Amino acid sequence: MMVRKGAATKAPQQPKPKAQQQPGGRRRRRGRSMEPVSRPLNPPAAVGSTLKAGRGRTAGVSDWFDTGMITSYLGGFQRTAGTTDSQVFIVSPAALDRVGTIAKAYALWRPKHWEIVYLPRCSTQTDGSIEMGFLLDYADSVPTNTRTMASSTSFTTSNVWGGGDGSSLLHTSVKSMGNAVTSALPCDEFSNKWFKLSWSTPEESENAHLTDTYVPARFVVRSDFPVVTADQPGHLWLRSRILLKGSVSPSTNL
């Protein structure tokens, strides 16, 4: 081929290098940086019977404390000779020996679970029945017979020798399907209410409305059978879980 004089000649162009390919014809991707990224980590909350404490997420919310599920001995089921008098137990953190010191460092509390479990310690030949229930208003009179007792909240009754399978409830949150005698406070009614924390025993002259500000309920237990000789046919156990709120000096709750 002839080339014209004076015409610029172009050097042959070299082919551009192709990107290195992996098997399959795909282009190798650029790797990501493996440098650690600083991110806030939220620790997992404890569950079960572990005691839990924390601070509210919203500014201005007081510190709180969750006791988790706790089993406590409430007392013996006593029957007085010749009478059918009732035993009355105040629903209060004062009944919880394991958290008494901690509870005194808070101003308010709320029951999340409050269940009484009766365990018999008498023979099946023992006469009489046990009656259990709660009074939600401190102005309510303590029942003196089965008719008035039956109108109490979460009323339950059984032979005094019944309820042997309730012992399984003291070690698990699973409801026993066997022979258990229990009475549980309807704590859902207090889901939006806090009670003042106090170790004081309500006085007879105290206004009932004032008492209701720190005592959500009373647990009542009685026998329908007047025994000749005083006895103790069984024991009362408490399964509870409470919330505490508002840090204060422990000396405030004496």
From Swiss-Prot:
A Gene Ontology molecular function term of the record: RNA binding
Gene Ontology annotations for the cellular component aspect, listed alphabetically: T=3 icosahedral viral capsid
Residues covered by region (S domain, virion shell): 62-245
Main location: virion
PROSITE patterns linked: ICOSAH_VIR_COAT_S
Region (R domain, interaction with RNA): 1-61
InterPro entries the UniProt entry points to: Capsid_prot_S-dom_vir, Viral_coat
Annotated transmembrane regions: none
Amino acid composition bias (Low complexity), ranges on this chain: 1-24
Keywords recorded for this protein, A-Z: Capsid protein, RNA-binding, T=3 icosahedral capsid protein, Virion
Tree of life domain: Viruses
Pfam families: Viral_coat
Family the UniProt entry places it in: Belongs to the icosahedral plant coat protein family.
Role summary: Capsid protein self-assembles to form an icosahedral capsid with a T=3 symmetry, about 30 nm in diameter, and consisting of 180 capsid proteins. Each icosahedral unit contains three protein subunits (Potential).
Name this polypeptide is given: Capsid protein
Organism of derivation: Cocksfoot mottle virus (isolate Dactylis glomerata/Norway/CfMV-NO/1995)
